[in-house]
Amino acid sequence: MKNSPKLLNLMNIKEKLTKYLDLIKSLEHPMHQDDILKFMYLLKRDRLSSGPYPKVSLFEAANRIFSDLVIWLGVKQLLNDRMVDNTRLPFTEYKVRFSVRAGHDLEADSGTVHLIGEAFHVAPSLYKKKLADTVKKLQDKNADYKLIIFNSDALENHDRDPEKSNPSMLYLPVYVPKTLNEISNLI
C-alpha cells in the first residue's frame, strides 16, 4: 500500500474503507501444509503477491493490516463522534498515513489547532510496553492534541480504562472485529 497521506472525512471514509477491505479480500495466502513447521515458515517468509501489502509475508501483512484497521475504525469513530472522553475535538477531517516508519499515523488541523496521533494493534501481553513507547514518542511533540488509538481487546487483563485522557494526551480504544463481514457491517 502506498504510503501517501489520505484525507478522510465523513464524505469519503465509507468508500475508501470499502476499497481497502476489497484489497484485503483479494489477498491470496498459503494454504495449510501437512508439516506445521513448513506452514509457519511460509506464514513468516513467503511473500504475498496481492492485497494491500504485496511483497511482504502474510505475517507482516497481518500486522500492518490490523494496525491499518485501528486507524480506519478510529478515524471513522472520531468523524461520527468528536468526543474522546471529556474532550471534544474540532476536526472534520484527518490526514492518515498507513504503515508509517517515520512521522505520525494521523494529523488534523482546524485553523490554529493541531492534532498528531499514533495508532497500533497489539496483543494484551505487549500493550503496556507499546503504550509507554507511543506516549514517549508523542509527549515532546508540539501539538494542541495528541491522540493514541489502539485495539480495545489489548486492554484484556489490564484496567479497562487505560489512562485518563486530557487534551495533551488522548486515548481512544477501538473495537476491531475479527472478520471482514463484521467490519463491513460497521461501515
Task: Pin down the residues of each PLM region.
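Nuclease-adjacent, charged terminal/linker segments that flank catalytic cores
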Residues: 1-47
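Metal-dependent nuclease catalytic core centered on acidic motifs
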Residues: 28, 62-63, 77, 147-171, ...
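Acidic-basic catalytic patches of nuclease active cores, encompassing PD-(D/E)XK
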Residues: 47-95
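Short, well-structured alpha-helical interface segments that form or flank functional binding sites
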Residues: 65-69, 73, 101, 129-133
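A short beta-turn/loop motif at secondary-structure boundaries
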Residues: 96-100
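Active-site beta-strand-loop-beta-strand hairpin of nuclease catalytic cores
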Residues: 104-117
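Catalytic cores of nucleic-acid endonucleases
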Residues: 119-173
